[in-house]
Amino acid sequence: ALVGMGGGSRAVVRMGEGKLDEANKILGNCTLLLMILGLAATVVFQLCKEPMLYLFGATENTIGYSMDYLNIYLYGSIFVELALGLNFFITSQGFSTVGMASVIIGAVVNIVLDPILIFGLNMGVKGAALATITAQAVSAVWVVRFLCGRRTKLRIQRRLLRLDAKVLAPVLALGLSPFIMQSTESLVNIAFNSSLKTYGGDPAVGAMTICSSIMQVFSLLFQGLSQGAQPIVGYNYGAGQLDRVKRTFRLLFFSSLCFSCAACAALELFPGLFVSLFNDKPELVEIAVWALHIYAAGMFMLGVQFSCQQTFVALGQTRVSLFLALLRKVILLIPLILLLPRFLSDQVFAVFLAEPVADILAATTTGAIFFWRLPRILEKRRLELEHRPI
């Protein structure tokens, strides 16, 4: 997200402005940086993998399996970086089918190889890791091959594989917002799990795992809608087609809001149906259903949060998108997880309540800022275009 989404958003705006050479420079810089980051991740995480695994919940019983998996998986870091990071440059040009194919191809390869390596060759966890990095390598080859081909306007060119601070600085600044949204998820999980372990024990932690898994599935759908609209917004903003920017955002906003309201209603009315997809133990299902009623209560506002924040990214609004990325999880959610149990007698209820409170406050703030700033952003762009030399 840091390199791919920031670079893809910047590149599509430059394409809209008719500056294809600059867009290709962005792609070249991002490609090389993704390769460097992939190699660096392999080295760094190999050096500190054991304490890192314990930090994220590994125990004496599971550390051996975790180490076996990570020892192999880390060697595929460069493939992950290229497959995921460069995919943004494909979808930002409108090749959504190609972008989707890169994900599906990797998934199919992984599904086919898993039983062969895990059971057929009796490799166990190591086989699962090998299947995963093989699938990621296939996806990476697919993505790179497409971006070197003739169908795409943005092409990977050897002469442009260089690092230029002037090109990368705005890319990284813009990509920081989605990067923080994804990376802070680990901090949120640590805060939730440690608090629930203290106040409710293992059953509460298990219920939280189910609730967060359900929420993650729906969040991916919100992200898909937002990321599908991003290249359209960015290209037309760069091209000066400001009415199209407004129309695209309106469609994104109302479709996201309708979907989030429908998802919230479904989870509140049929929580048992969704919980049973993840676990069938009666004791855990009972507490998870109770928890999901609380946890999903603010979900109806997520459509506002995602559509407004991702549109800020598409418009190149670095500072405000960074603030909004920090707002929901770092500024609101984590402090609420730690503070609410101090003020409510039912402390487990208080921990789960932190999620809807943060969702509603963050979405309300995001929406207010967006609808106040959008007319000013578009008016500034209109004036820039009027005074631009012909």
List each model region and its residues.
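Interfacial/gating helices of multi-pass transporter permease domains
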Residues: 61-65, 125-126, 167-174, 195-216, ...
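Membrane-interface helix-loop junctions in multi-pass transport and translocation proteins
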Residues: 97, 107-140, 286, 330-364, ...
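Short membrane-interface helical motifs at transmembrane helix boundaries
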Residues: 40-72, 262-289
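Alpha-helical transmembrane segments of multi-pass membrane proteins
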Residues: 60-86, 173, 210, 216, ...
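Helix-terminus/linker motif at the lipid-water interface of multi-pass membrane proteins
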Residues: 53-60, 116-123, 183-213, 217, ...
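Small-residue-rich hydrophobic transmembrane alpha-helices
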Residues: 1-43, 80-99, 207-271, 302-321
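Short runs within selected transmembrane alpha-helices of multi-pass transporters and secretion channels
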Residues: 73-91, 99-107, 128-141, 223-226, ...
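Interhelical loop/hinge segments that connect adjacent transmembrane helices in multipass membrane
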Residues: 132, 141-185, 376-390
